[in-house]
């Protein structure tokens, strides 16, 4: 997961002009500014929590935000707010499938907020990428990747709370 995110950040840094802000625990790959200004924040060094760093990030107005891990409700809520306000947000969450990722985000919120969160996700979600390492018969491991793109159909199912239908699309 770290290598995949580092590759995505490197691609954006080489391809687009803008401001990239990463919030990580720990910083695993150091990104030098190329076409983008890259600022990297590390938990325990530059900030006390992902949520605190995200609050500060929204004042810095980055174009792209990488959240190393969405561990709590506050962080998830702030990541959604950042996406709603036009930031491209990359974040990690430990789940086993794309629909379960959406479930986990929604379930982090109290029941009375879940309809609103489904609406937010349906408006902002671009994609979910799920990775797992599978054992090879010959030894070693190989990456298996699931990609769910935020198509109109996927967005509608998220909004309507019909996540169980996503694998059928």
What are these regions (language model features)?
Residues 1-169:
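Short, flexible helix-loop junctions that flank or precede catalytic/ligand sites
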